[in-house]
Amino acid sequence: MPVNLGQALGLLPFLAKAEDATFSGSDVIQQRELANPETARQLFRQFRYQVMSGPQETLRQLRKLCFQWLRPEVHTKEQILEILMLEQFLTILPGEIQMWVRKQCPGSGEEAVTLVESLKGDPQKLWQWISIQVLGQEIPFEKENSARCRGDKVEPALEAEPTVEVVPQDLPLQNTSSAPGELLSHGVKEESDLEPELALAASQLPARPEERPTRDQEVGTALLPSLQEEQWRHLDSTQKEQYWDLMLETYGKMVSGVAGISNSKPDLTNMAEYGEELVGLHLHSAEKMARAPCKEDRQENDKENLNLENHRDQGCLDVFDQAPGEAPPQTALSDFFGESEPHHFGGESVPEALENLQGEGTGAHLFPHERGSGKQLGQHIQSSSSGELSALWLEEKREASQKGQARAPMAQKLPTCRECGKTFYRNSQLVFHQRTHTGETYFHCRICKKAFLRSSDFVKHQRTHTGEKPCKCDYCGKGFSDFSGLRHHEKIHTGEKPYKCPICEKSFIQRSNFNRHQRVHTGEKPYKCTHCGKRFSWSSSLDKHQRSHLGKKPCP
């Protein structure tokens, strides 16, 4: 049964960026009894790991924040499930639609779906709300909804107060990314949901001089082509400043602390000269952001081997597809308001891109430059209104294609051992393997003169001389020199026996005991006496037998 969650998911001012929303242990204690469920929800969602507190304290604080948000002492399991489903549904919505739906304070998932469906029939509703937020004005209907969400009483005078609307009512909803109007839709997103690739566009904005804007017609045409010139003239200087602030908030804020780019506004009089370039940069930035790190990796990988390059390029794709710890990817507006033209992903049609993603899944059939350019990322690459940017992009793709054709197949360049023919992923692995043929060792024990290839084996061996046992059992306190011995010992306390014989169903703690037991059923005798050729199933039986050839009596 749906529960009314208007209070729990009502619209409140969003928190700052995720990196700024950190809470210490004292902050959590102060929020023990939160009267506002929305504040508790945002405290839980924005909570970050504190290194100084440690994992146990962090988990305790996170559990407390979760209890404050979901309130299991008040809500039933069905109500808690409804809260989580509604929260996840709102999170995956596009930023513009998400903010609008949260403004309406949906009480359940079904109500949120109804609100989203209503936008399909009347997309003007969303654009009107966006324009009102940009201009800083509210009509009485919006004020009444906001007051009801907060639980305040609506004054009669507020309902009857006339409002002069300067926002055009016939703004068309544009979905083509070649139109700069799409930049407005990105301006109302939360700062934590802004995609990092937009930072490249901010670096192209020139610093704004101290002069005031004079050519209003060019400004209106460059910022929002759907805004008619006649309507742009009716906006005063303050409203135009707020219009630009929205654009700058999208492209400038998140870059100011990283790249040192100024947040100063460019001269609005020159805005028409590069208004179209903003759109081209927005489309072109995702391509360059995906390709740039992979290009640096290729320069390093050429020094080692081509196969390592393959793995690192795949890593670049994984990182670009979904950044860790961030919100789930949001759906594009075009998925709600369909287009007649087919989408293209990295130069491929939708079926071709899906076939590549569902094939090998690793991009092994692509050249490294194709993986780095986002051919499997599903990036929405469309034609830009700037001819120079389109020509530049095509030229870069052509050069990358020529470089890729000159490369030899991957399998022919894998590092291979000349002695045994074994192949490896890295040259470093091949060098280490070759020591087994040459007998070369790097680590020598000063006490017993024993040599080792690996440093980890050398450290374990030294503990036999020093008696050091750093690994302690939590149950009985017994010490062990390595973690493998500790893991085997802990199975005695837990009763875990992961190795089970499929014939007699007998279980064993250690793999070695399980392997010895299987020889009883198979009759395998791998240990052979070098004197008489007799074979044995266990090494201990072979040792006893060899003593008979040497004339020694077995130990009692």
From Swiss-Prot:
Chain positions covered by the region annotation Disordered: 169-195
Keywords of the record: DNA-binding, Metal-binding, Nucleus, Repeat, Transcription, Transcription regulation, Zinc, Zinc-finger
KRAB domain boundaries: 218-291
Single GO cellular component term: nucleus
GO molecular function, one term: zinc ion binding
Chief localization: nucleus
InterPro entries (UniProt xref): KRAB, KRAB_dom_sf, SCAN_dom, SCAN_sf, Znf_C2H2_sf, Znf_C2H2_type
GO annotation terms (biological process): regulation of transcription by RNA polymerase II
Cystine pairs: none
Ranges of residues in domain SCAN box: 41-123
Pfam families per record: KRAB, SCAN, zf-C2H2
Zinc finger C2H2-type: from-to: 415-437, 443-465, 471-493, 499-521, 527-549
Locations listed in the record: Nucleus
Annotated PANTHER family: ZINC FINGER AND SCAN DOMAIN-CONTAINING, ZINC FINGER PROTEIN 18
Family stated for the protein in its record: Belongs to the krueppel C2H2-type zinc-finger protein family.
Function as written in the Swiss-Prot or TrEMBL entry: May be involved in transcriptional regulation.
Protein known as: Zinc finger protein 18
Source organism per UniProt: Rattus norvegicus
